[in-house]
C-alpha cells in the first residue's frame, strides 16, 4: 500500500472517531490495509469488520465502546433495526452493563443468534424505525415496551426510570401506550406492571435495581428523595429510599455507591478521602433526622437472602407476597451459628463522627 493510501485510511479513522463509531472497510484495498495494521498492532478489531485505534479504544468506557460498535454495525448492515436494550442504549437511556451484548435487532422471523452470539434477533414488527445518532432503532415507546416485557423487573426498571428521569415521556403516556398494545403481544401484563412501578425520582441505575429488588422480596415500595431537615442547622437532605410507618417512625434506606469513593470525578476536588468524610457527615446527620438508617451496597442488593434479612431487621414493612423465592440461610452457616444468637445491628453514636 502506498503512503497516500495510508494517509487516506488515517483520515477516515479520524472521521470515525469524530462520529464516535468504529471504522469499517469500504473496499478490498482498505480491508487489506486494515488487516495489515491489525497484525502490526496499530489498529484493533473489537468485532469482525470493525476497527479502531487501540489508544483511542482504551480511553472509552464500556458504554461508549458498545455504542461505537453499534454504530459501526449499522454502517455494515444498513437495513438492521436495533430494538430492546440495544435501542435503549442508542437512545441515551440507562441500561445495565450485562445487556450491552448481545446486540438486539428486529426480525420478523423471530429469535435467532448471529455472528457467533454477538447478535440476537427478536420478533418485532409494526413500528416505524427512527434514527438516533446514525442508528436505526425502534421508536422510544416501542423500545420501552419491549424492554419492559423482555427484561427482568430489575433490568427493565433501570431503563424505564431513566426515561422518566430525563423527561422523555410521562408515566401516564408510557402506561397508556403499553395498555394499547394488549392484542398480539406476549408479556403485556408484565410490561404494564413494570411501567406502573417506574419512578423518575430514582437518581441512577443502582437505585432502580435496589428498588426493584425490594419489591421482588415483598417489601413495600419506598418513597424516593424524601426531604428531611437536619436538627442542628436546618440543612436539607434527600433520602435515597424511605418508609413512614403508621406510628410515625421514619426508616431511611441509603445505597452506598462505591463509585463515589473510586471515581475521582465523583469524589470532587477534595479527593477520595474528602468524599469519605462528607459521606460520614451525611450519615451522622441522617441518623439525627431519621429513626433508623439502613445502608447497603449493590453487592448486598444482589444477595436476596442478605438483603431480605437486612431490611427486615430494620423493620422495613412488607405488603405483598415475594415475587421470587427467597433463599434460606446456607446450610454451612446454619451449622456454625448458635440458634440463640440474634442478628445484631451496630448503633453508632453521633459523637463517634466528631460532631
For the regions a language model picked out, list residue spans one by one:
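Short gly/ser-rich loop at a beta-strand->alpha-helix junction or flexible surface loop bordering the NTP-binding
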Residues: 1-187, 316-355
Amino acid at each position: 500500500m502506498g503512503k497516500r493510501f495510508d494517509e487516506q485510511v488515517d483520515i477516515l479513522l479520524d472521521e470515525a472517531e469524530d462520529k464516535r463509531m468504529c471504522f469499517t472497510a469500504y473496499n478490498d484495498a482498505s480491508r487489506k490495509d486494515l488487516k495489515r495494521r491489525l497484525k502490526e498492532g496499530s489498529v484493533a478489531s473489537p468485532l469482525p469488520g470493525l476497527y479502531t485505534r487501540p489508544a483511542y479504544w482504551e480511553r472509552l468506557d464500556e458504554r461508549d465502546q458498545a455504542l461505537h460498535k453499534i454504530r459501526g454495525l449499522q454502517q455494515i448492515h444498513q437495513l438492521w433495526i436495533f430494538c430492546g436494550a440495544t435501542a435503549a442504549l442508542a437512545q441515551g437511556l440507562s441500561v445495565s452493563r450485562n445487556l450491552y451484548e448481545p446486540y438486539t435487532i428486529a426480525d420478523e422471523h423471530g429469535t435467532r443468534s448471529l455472528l457467533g452470539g454477538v447478535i440476537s434477533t427478536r420478533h418485532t414488527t409494526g413500528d416505524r424505525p427512527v434514527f438516533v445518532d446514525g442508528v436505526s432503532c425502534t421508536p422510544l415507546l416501542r423500545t420501552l415496551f419491549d424492554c419492559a416485557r423482555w427484561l427482568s423487573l430489575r433490568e427493565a426498571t433501570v431503563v424505564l426510570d431513566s426515561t422518566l428521569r430525563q423527561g422523555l415521556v410521562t408515566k401516564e403516556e408510557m402506561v397508556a401506550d403499553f395498555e394499547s398494545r394488549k392484542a398480539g403481544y406476549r408479556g403485556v401484563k408484565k410490561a404494564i406492571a413494570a411501567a406502573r412501578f417506574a419512578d423518575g425520582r430514582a437518581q441512577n441505575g443502582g437505585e432502580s435495581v435496589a428498588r426493584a429488588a425490594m419489591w421482588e422480596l415483598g417489601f413495600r415500595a419506598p418513597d424516593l428523595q424524601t426531604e428531611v431537615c437536619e436538627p442542628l442547622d436546618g440543612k436539607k437532605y434527600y433520602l435515597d429510599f424511605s418508609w413512614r410507618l403508621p406510628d410515625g417512625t421514619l426508616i431511611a434506606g441509603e445505597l452506598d455507591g462505591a463509585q463515589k469513593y473510586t471515581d475521582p470525578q465523583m469524589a470532587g476536588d477534595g479527593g477520595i478521602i474528602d468524599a469519605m468524610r462528607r459521606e460520614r457527615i451525611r450519615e451522622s446527620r441522617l441518623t439525627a433526622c431519621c429513626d433508623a438508617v439502613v445502608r447497603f451496597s449493590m453487592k448486598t442488593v444482589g444477595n436476596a437472602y442478605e438483603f431480605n434479612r437486612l431490611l427486615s431487621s430494620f423493620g422495613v414493612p412488607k405488603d405483598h407476597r415475594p415475587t421470587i423465592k427467597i433463599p434460606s440461610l446456607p446450610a454451612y452457616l446454619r451449622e456454625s451459628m448458635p440458634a440463640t444468637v440474634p442478628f445484631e445491628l451496630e448503633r453508632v453514636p453521633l459523637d463517634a463522627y466528631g460532631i
